[in-house]
């Protein structure tokens, strides 16, 4: 079998990977004409089956849950199928293909040990004569803030303060020195192409042009560009709504119909409430920046061949949740008038209100009012609204 060069894009998460993958998918034919092939058997956009291939049997996630892969035997069959499919796909490539592109941000979040990355190396080694690991890294607090929106879309029941606790140098998800070392230990430092996720440092101030430069491809009119933003964050209001729905209806519920409805609702929120979400306070930013300063400087020195701080010190604007009446009216208009919801969603809003009534009556009132917009004649809904109005006087 002809061996080729492999470009392995490992993320990291929250560094425009969805936009890159959409570009690669939409330009498959143009890339083939230039001798590059974007792997499809492991996932048509996100090649997620490959990082999942290297995960331990005792660790599961949404990838396996969605596919009902629950036992060690089912994992074994999944690995056999993934390996066979990849082999068939690469074996069938014409000789004109000199380079293979693989992309998944889940290499960053799911393959967190050197031994897991070694599994990836062993899987790919029959197919490459050379390999280049492409990795974008983003300042830790920005990563956290963007990740929080993704976690809400995925069903987290924990608020921002909970996830903030994990943003420490002990966590290889955020500690890029530790994370990159695992890849170096398996592939060698010279195989890594580490880029700072910062528009000011991109080639032509453009992420796609920058990524193409990593592939040693000149930007050209041969490629179509995806103009619609991909995988945007939720604004604070969308985050509050999404979190409340998740808390009322956690993913572990056995009622699949309710979970399906919840996902549809989260999708509506995603489409209508894009924007900058909550961020750390200036004090939290300063503490986190200092905690990562030395490891970030080492990454800057080792991989970017530069001295000083990896990221500029830039305190965020404190973007905390502030729900006012105008925002609620906007929510009602967008979620119900602009995108009509089926009557069953009144139950979701009603139960979200009941969840909040003992701890935050104003939020309970907001969600019960949403339920009334969908089901104006609901007896329990109207009774509760009257109770809330009396208590809020």
What are these regions (language model features)?
Residues 348, 380-381:
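TPR alpha-solenoid repeat register
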Residues 355, 387-392:
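TPR/TPR-like alpha-solenoid repeats
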Residues 370-371:
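Canonical positions in the second alpha-helix
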Residues 1-360:
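Anion-recognition interface
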């Amino acid at each position: 079998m002809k061996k080729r060069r492999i470009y392995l894009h490992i993320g990291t998460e929250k560094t425009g990977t969805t936009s890159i993958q959409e570009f690669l998918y939409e330009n498959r034919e143009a890339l083939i004409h230039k001798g590059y092939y974007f792997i499809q058997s492991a996932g048509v956009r996100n090649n997620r089956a490959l990082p999942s291939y290297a995960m331990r049997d005792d660790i599961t996630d949404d990838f396996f849950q969605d596919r009902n892969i629950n036992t060690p035997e089912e994992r074994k069959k999944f690995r056999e199928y993934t390996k066979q499919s990849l082999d068939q796909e690469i074996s069938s490539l014409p000789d004109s293909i000199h380079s293979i592109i693989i992309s998944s941000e889940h290499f960053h979040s799911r393959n967190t040990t050197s031994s897991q990355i070694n599994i990836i190396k062993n899987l790919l080694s029959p197919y490459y004569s050379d390999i280049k690991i492409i990795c974008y890294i983003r300042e830790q607090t920005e990563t956290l803030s963007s990740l929080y929106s993704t976690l809400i879309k995925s069903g987290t029941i924990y608020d921002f303060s909970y996830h903030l606790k994990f943003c420490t140098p002990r966590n290889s998800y955020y500690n890029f020195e530790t994370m990159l070392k695992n890849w170096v230990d398996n592939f060698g430092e010279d195989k890594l192409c580490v880029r700072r996720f910062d528009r000011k440092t991109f080639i032509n101030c453009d992420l796609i042009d920058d990524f193409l430069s990593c592939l040693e491809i000149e930007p050209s009119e041969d490629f179509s560009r995806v103009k619609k933003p991909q995988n945007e964050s939720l604004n604070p209001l969308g985050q509050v709504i999404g979190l409340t729905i998740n808390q009322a209806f956690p993913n572990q519920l056995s009622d699949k119909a309710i979970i399906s409805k919840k996902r549809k609702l989260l999708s509506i929120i995603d489409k209508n409430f894009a924007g900058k979400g909550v961020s750390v306070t200036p004090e939290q930013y300063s503490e986190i920046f200092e905690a990562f300063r030395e490891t970030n400087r080492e990454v800057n020195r080792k991989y970017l061949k530069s001295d000083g701080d990896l990221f500029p010190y830039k305190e965020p604007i404190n973007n905390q949740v502030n729900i006012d009446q105008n925002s609620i009216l906007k929510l009602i208009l967008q979620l119900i008038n602009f995108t009509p919801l089926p009557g069953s969603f009144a139950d979701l809003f009603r139960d979200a209100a009941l969840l909040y009534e003992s701890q935050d009556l104003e939020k309970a009132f907001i969600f019960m009012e949403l339920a009334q917009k969908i089901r104006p004649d609901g007896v329990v809904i109207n009774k509760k609204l009257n109770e809330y109005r009396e208590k809020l006087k």
